[in-house]
A protein has these predicted regions:
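Conserved nucleotide-cofactor-binding alpha/beta core module
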Residues: 99-102, 106
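Internal gly/pro-rich beta-alpha loop/helix module
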Residues: 140-141, 146-236
Length: 514
């Protein structure tokens, strides 16, 4: 999301409560808020597409449709070719939506019923077309005002057909409040949803715009508060991670700093044939400033790990009991453990995890460390499951986790006192009694082998310096995502996990400069 947005994310219930408070104030009514919303959306449309000669609003039957009717009236008054295609006849509307439709029609806005057999089209039609374009001015931009934030059931006809027409129009799309068909709480698509280029959301930033499939469908998000007072900070349950939080979580270095102050990290992993995962985690810990990183791995993996000369390597015996005994000695002098990258799922791995648990050290549990049955992880630990691992921890399925990621995070927090990072597009970070966080940065290049190992190592490296599992997790998630963005801007596809690790210092420098 390139635009600067507030950090607070609100549920539908919280937004409705704010709206009720605003309407209780003297001199404010529903039509006033509707006019403010329409004006904000019109201003954003003209800013985003300054050459637009007009727009067509697809209006549904509720207040979201009312916003659309009002926007058409304001657009007409501004000299644009603004038109309405409605799925619910204006004479059947109620309240503010009815008043907005009446105002729009009185202003001379052309309004016709949506015809699913014709769709929207891009051919010149009765509304006229500029010479040589073949596209009617009113089709320069399509405005989605079909469904608002209250939808919780799958989209039905005729709205579903109107959404399909918008998505197949080939025109720029601006959505009002949320893209129609997207759950404003979970970010789940309810059968079918509008794919918007820009979404102007009203009063507050909704959680569903950043959760799940929300970012894919919302496009660039802009907020119009409509002069409604924000929710008190003590009532906020979700926030998006911003640069200020990250900056505060990165320990500053004095000019006379030495490596001993960077903390000692032990990576436990690198089973036979899986040296790369442990090495990536170790490199990431170094890249964020850890003072010393030791990789405890299988003897067969030691040479591959040692190819990174800055890493210390401790080969472990093949015998599980002997390996666990040796590992306990190493953990006794470590400040932080990162367990799981390339660890494996055999008795050797299980014995090492037992030693990790017995050490009591702050620990990042990742990858194979999350495969085995896990009792309640304590508050000094960080769990980093991807959706499949989260499903295993919860005894569910990946599809259920992805259908409602915030609910999955809450379920994990019910079971563990640890910080939990639910990885994926829009990674979530939570811990009991804290405001949960969502990362709105990142790029699909992060969906590559080894990037999770890099994230685990980065968390461990920051934790070794700060001693704060929460701050380390929040900062590492954001830095990891930002590193991916920076590389994607330069290289596009084909970015390797090792390159993500190498880009972490630049991401840190960037946030520390701002």
């Amino acid at each position: 999301m390139p635009m600067e947005l507030p950090v607070s994310l609100l549920s539908v219930a919280q937004v409705r409560a704010l709206e009720r408070r605003a309407l209780a104030a003297p001199g404010v009514d529903g039509l006033t808020l509707m006019r403010r919303a329409a004006q904000a959306a019109l201003s954003r449309l003209r800013e985003q597409w300054p050459g637009a000669r007009g727009f067509t609003v697809l209006c549904g039957g509720g207040n979201n449709g009312g916003d659309g009717w009002m926007m058409a009236a304001l657009g007409r008054a501004a000299g644009l070719d603004a038109r309405v295609s409605w799925t619910h006849p204006p004479q059947g509307l109620r309240g503010e939506a009815s008043a907005a439709a009446a105002e729009s029609l009185a202003a001379g806005v052309p309004a016709t019923p949506f015809d699913s057999s014709r769709g929207l089209g891009t051919e010149a039609g009765p509304c006229g077309a500029s010479a040589g374009t073949g596209v009617a001015p009113a089709l320069d931009v399509i405005v989605d005002a079909l469904l608002g934030i209250g939808i919780v059931e799958p989209v039905r006809a005729p709205i579903a057909a109107a959404i399909a027409a918008i998505n197949s129009s080939g025109r720029p799309v601006l959505a009002l409040d949320v893209p129609s068909g997207l759950c404003a709480d979970s970010g789940r698509v309810l059968g079918v949803a509008v794919r918007a280029d820009v979404t102007v959301t009203f009063i507050a930033l909704k959680t569903g715009l950043l959760f799940g499939e929300g970012p894919e469908y919302a496009g660039c998000v802009a907020l119009a508060t409509l002069e409604v007072a924000p929710l008190p900070s003590e009532e906020v349950v979700w926030q998006r991670i911003d640069a200020a939080q990250v900056r505060a979580a990165i320990p500053l270095r004095r000019r006379d700093a030495h490596k001993g102050q960077g903390g000692r990290v032990c990576i436990v992993g690198g089973g036979e044939g899986m040296a790369g995962a442990a090495r990536l985690a170790g490199e990431a810990a170094l890249r964020v400033g850890a003072g010393r990183v030791t990789v405890a791995c299988a003897a067969a993996s030691a040479a591959a790990v040692a190819a990174r000369p800055e890493l210390m390597v401790q080969p472990l015996p093949l015998d599980p009991i002997a390996a666990a005994t040796r590992l306990a000695e190493l953990l006794a002098v470590a400040d932080v453990i990162v367990a799981g990258p390339g660890l494996g799922r055999d008795p050797w791995a299980l014995a090492l995890l037992a030693a990790v648990r017995e050490s009591g050290r702050p620990t990042v549990l990742d990858a194979d460390a999350l495969f085995f049955p896990l009792t309640e992880a304590p508050a000094n630990c960080v769990l980093t499951p991807h959706p499949g691992e989260a499903a295993r921890l919860l005894g569910g399925t990946t599809s259920l986790v992805q259908a409602d990621r915030p609910a999955a995070l809450r379920a994990l927090l019910d079971r563990h006192a640890a910080v939990v990072v639910l990885k994926g597009a829009g990674s979530l970070v939570g811990q009991r009694s804290r405001v949960s966080q969502v990362c709105d940065r990142g790029h699909p290049v992060l969906a590559a082998p080894g990037t999770g190992d890099v994230l685990a190592g980065a968390i461990g490296g920051l934790l070794a310096q700060s001693g704060d599992p929460w701050g380390a997790a929040v900062a590492a998630v954001w830095l990891h995502a930002r590193a991916g963005e920076r590389l994607a801007n330069d290289a596009g596809r084909g970015v390797l996990a090792g390159e993500i690790a190498a880009a972490l210092p630049a991401a840190m420098a960037e946030v520390l400069r701002t």
